[in-house]
Amino acid sequence: MENVTLSPDGKSVVIIDQTKLPNAIEYLTLSTSRQMYDAIFALKVRGAPAIGICAGFSIYCLAQTIEETEYDAFLLKFREYKDYLDSSRPTAVNLSWALKRMGKVVLDAKDKSIDEILSLLKAECIAIKEEDIKICKAISEYGLEFLKDGDGILTHCNAGPLATSQYGTALGPLILGKERGMNFKVFADETRPLLQGARLTAFELHEAGIDVTLICDNMASIVMKNGFINACFVGCDRVAENGDTANKIGTSGVAILAKHYGIPFYVMCPTSTIDLNCKTGDDIEIELRSEDEIKSKWYEKPMAPSDVKCYNPAFDVTDHNLITAIITEHGVCKAPFEVSLREAVKKAEDIINK
């Protein structure tokens, strides 16, 4: 079940509409810049790596529609599309990372024909997805080192195959362990207000044959206190240089509880999610979303007075002091994060620049 791919003719992006899960598996074909923007903004495609993959495919498809045959005019229109897609969601760094990577292809090909540039763009967006498959497998292998057969794991939001291209990040070690005969007891936070834990994580783990129990977000403390949890596994959307980590709203609360109960808290992400230009979590822009997601989205009738104000940040920042380790495809990063994260990013850059 591929969640993000190119259409057979390479002119459109095909995604699973994650807003319809788990009740229906519906595929959407994205052919225009507006459709692509809306798919990312409305969370029809979500998860930092999956957003990056979708952005890479999208900008390639849009580049094919540019009618300009002269390089400078082509570049100008390409940048318009790139900036438009980049504005869809501000917190997940993989979006801008993928678009910058595609943009570099165009900048480095000034002396080539437009047809040659399009061929290079196609190769690059396909490479982004193929690399993500290998990255998720590597993260899963490293993460599995921190698991024992029978462990109880708490998750928040969704960082499984739907959020990436295969295996996932935070769910990857669990799925890989299951493939190798291990068993786990996973407690999945429902993850209000958009219920990614209920709709997506519980769905993926159940499909994988993993023992999963869905809980409300405000039940995280009691399952920890009861001794049900051996570790917390989460993904993330951006990591600052000092190790502060932006992830789905509610993640920082889970980390604080884990610290209180002496439970290790692991963050799993590709190095593309690490933003060394962002010094601390204070520098991460937090996306604010519609009040309707809280008051009315999941109900036949609104569950609050229509004129009641709502505060709906999509993400919060987990302080680096609460994080046991950040697990990447190039190894396990521990404090001091300024050193270990930079080393992981350098390994990734060295491979790309070979």
Swiss-Prot record:
Lineage top rank: taxon: Bacteria
Pfam families with a match to the protein in the record: IF-2B (PF01008)
Site (Transition state stabilizer): 157
Keyword annotations: Carbohydrate metabolism, Isomerase
Gene Ontology MF annotations: S-methyl-5-thioribose-1-phosphate isomerase activity
NCBIfam families membership: eIF-2B_rel (TIGR00524), PRK05720.1 (NF004326), salvage_mtnA (TIGR00512)
Cross-referenced HAMAP family: Deoxyribose1P_isomerase, Salvage_MtnA
Protein name, per record: 5-deoxyribose 1-phosphate isomerase
Native organism: Lachnoclostridium phytofermentans (strain ATCC 700394 / DSM 18823 / ISDg)
Classification of source organism: Bacteria, Bacillati, Bacillota, Clostridia, Lachnospirales
Gene (UniProt): drdI
